[in-house]
């Protein structure tokens, strides 16, 4: 019996790779041959390399898709076209049963190529509104899974909620040596804040913490900065560029998390029922998806939001105090949410859909 094969694609930011990294080991365990199409200079290649999964990576040309006129669009049209040809060549050689796309500009050529070869295309969209790459992908998709409910007019969409690996039980960090060291510098009488900005949104948080000395007079502060030059452990302050195993222990240590509005992160916080404040990237730095996500979470009673323009100590302190005073209300809303799906649940759903759409292939 021929080995089943799947190609993953998606990249440009960590958010366009995370779900793929949750699904890949499950496919490998079930005996699938796994391939990945991306940009060898992109975060997707770096993440696949670090994962040490048995994945065959194929690099293609990719162009940025813009909503505005630019002469660069002309060159990028050719890059996308070349990427489609490269993807066609890869798929003819690999002959996969299915393509799974998590979005990002690099995903467009493989999605188009798979559709041309009549390979079922499954796409995942994390945000309330589709990004440009996924708006294009939707036209070629067999099924698009969505975190948020979509309009009935989008007949190919299937609402699945958020897919997160977070264990909803609180883990103990009491035996963690690094956490013990950090606690020695923290004031046990103060609440602890955790700032996480994601791959694109940390700079404003980093600058705010550096420019706001009163922050560490009133709170213990953890700053996941993405910038190694800021690494520091001092009185009431721990700054680290990147964490893996330490992510959950640091999360457990925090009383309130201040985050950007990327859907992956905020749904992780929802799964943990963690008090959080969303400072979304504005339209000048994004397409406005984080503003929509933040408004949705605030409306549902999961979190409060604070605009970047109002990110100062007085405003932040006021929102933190309000969250803590109403902690039970927010946590009850989060724990009663039905918007979380485990990776195993989604994997089983995806397998069922693949089997249904791939019959005879």
Curated annotation (Swiss-Prot):
Q: Does the keyword Membrane apply?
A: yes
Chain residues that bind UDP-N-acetyl-alpha-D-glucosamine = 199, 290
- Gene Ontology cellular component terms for the protein in this record: plasma membrane
**Coiled-coil residues:** none
Keywords of the record: Cell cycle, Cell division, Cell membrane, Cell shape, Cell wall biogenesis/degradation, Glycosyltransferase, Membrane, Peptidoglycan synthesis, Transferase
What EC number(s) does this enzyme carry?
Answer: 2.4.1.227
Q: What HAMAP family has UniProt attached to this entry? A: MurG
Recorded protein name is: UDP-N-acetylglucosamine--N-acetylmuramyl-(pentapeptide) pyrophosphoryl-undecaprenol N-acetylglucosamine transferase
Give the species this sequence originates from: Streptococcus mutans serotype c (strain ATCC 700610 / UA159)
State the gene name recorded for this protein. murG
């Amino acid at each position: 019996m021929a080995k089943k094969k799947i190609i993953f694609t998606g990249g440009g930011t960590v958010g366009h790779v995370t779900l793929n990294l949750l699904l890949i080991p499950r496919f490998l365990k079930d005996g699938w041959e796994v391939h990945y199409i991306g940009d060898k200079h992109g975060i997707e290649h770096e993440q696949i390399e670090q994962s040490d999964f048995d994945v065959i990576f194929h690099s293609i040309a990719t162009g940025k898709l813009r909503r505005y006129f630019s002469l660069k669009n002309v060159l990028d049209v050719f890059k996308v076209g070349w990427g489609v040809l490269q993807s066609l060549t890869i798929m003819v050689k690999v002959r996969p049963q299915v393509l799974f796309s998590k979005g990002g500009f690099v995903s467009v050529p493989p999605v188009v190529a798979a559709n041309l070869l009549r390979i079922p295309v499954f796409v995942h969209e994390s945000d309330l509104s589709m990004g440009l790459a996924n708006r294009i992908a939707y036209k070629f998709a067999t099924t698009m899974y969505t975190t948020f409910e979509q309009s009935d007019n989008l007949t190919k969409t299937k609402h699945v909620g958020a897919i997160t690996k977070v264990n909803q039980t609180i883990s103990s960090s009491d035996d963690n040596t690094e956490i013990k060291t950090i606690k020695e510098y923290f004031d046990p009488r103060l609440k602890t804040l955790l700032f996480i900005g994601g791959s694109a949104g940390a700079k404003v948080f980093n600058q705010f913490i550096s420019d706001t000395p009163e922050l560490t007079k009133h709170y213990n502060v953890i700053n996941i900065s993405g910038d190694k030059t800021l690494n520091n452990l001092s009185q009431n302050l721990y700054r680290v560029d990147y964490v893996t195993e330490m992510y959950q222990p640091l999360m457990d240590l925090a009383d309130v998390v201040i985050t950007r509005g990327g859907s992956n992160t905020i749904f992780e916080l929802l799964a943990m029922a963690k008090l959080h404040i969303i400072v979304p990237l504005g339209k000048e730095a994004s397409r406005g998806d984080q503003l929509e996500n933040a408004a949705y979470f605030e409306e549902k009673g999961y979190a409060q939001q604070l605009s970047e323009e109002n990110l100062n100590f007085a405003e932040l302190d006021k929102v933190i105090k309000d969250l803590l005073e109403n902690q039970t209300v927010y946590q009850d809303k989060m724990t009663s949410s039905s918007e979380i799906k485990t990776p195993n649940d989604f994997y089983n759903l995806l397998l069922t859909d693949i089997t249904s759409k791939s019959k005879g292939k």
